[in-house]
Amino acid sequence: MSRRSTAEKETAKSDPIYRNRFINMLVNRILKHGKKSLAYRILYRAMKKIQQKTGKNPLSVSRQAIRGVTPDVTVKARRVGGSTYQVPIEIRSTQGKALAIRWLLGASRKRPGRNMAFKLSYELMDAARENGNAIRKKEETHRMAEAXRAFAHFR
């Protein structure tokens, strides 16, 4: 039996301007090659663009986008008797948010456009309006989970 105690989960710190942990999570996913100041600049420019385009609070728009993209279930590959099944599993809210952020950034990187701030702002606005590639990814995941519901007992 192990004498070691379980490590406590570190809480995400909040960003300096919006004082929001979700924004900091987004910045950490935008981050490339340790250039955090560049990641902050990209995100804050995207927020400014959202403010100009919608006239709404950019924080509420991004929260709405995350809420729209967060999946309830996902599929996990399980190997049973020589064949692999896609088994649907429910996911926790923190894991769902992490997936949603990853999908939003992936969709915005694939978007055609000038710069990352521009692409991210439009992807967040689209996700808040319930369309865009990130929303499509969530719906596709839910469809896969629904199709593989027969294998749910393999959990």
Curated annotation (Swiss-Prot):
Biological processes annotated in GO: translation
State the InterPro entries in the record. Answer: Ribosomal_uS7, Ribosomal_uS7_bac/org-type, Ribosomal_uS7_dom, Ribosomal_uS7_dom_sf
Q: Where this protein primarily resides, as one coarse class?
A: plastid
> What GO cellular-component annotations does this UniProt entry give?
chloroplast; small ribosomal subunit
**Pfam families, alphabetized:** Ribosomal_S7
Subunit structure of this entry? Part of the 30S ribosomal subunit.
Q: What function does this protein fulfil?
A: One of the primary rRNA binding proteins, it binds directly to 16S rRNA where it nucleates assembly of the head domain of the 30S subunit.
The family assignment reads: Belongs to the universal ribosomal protein uS7 family.
Q: What is this protein called?
A: Small ribosomal subunit protein uS7c
Q: Which organism is it from?
A: Ginkgo biloba (Ginkgo)
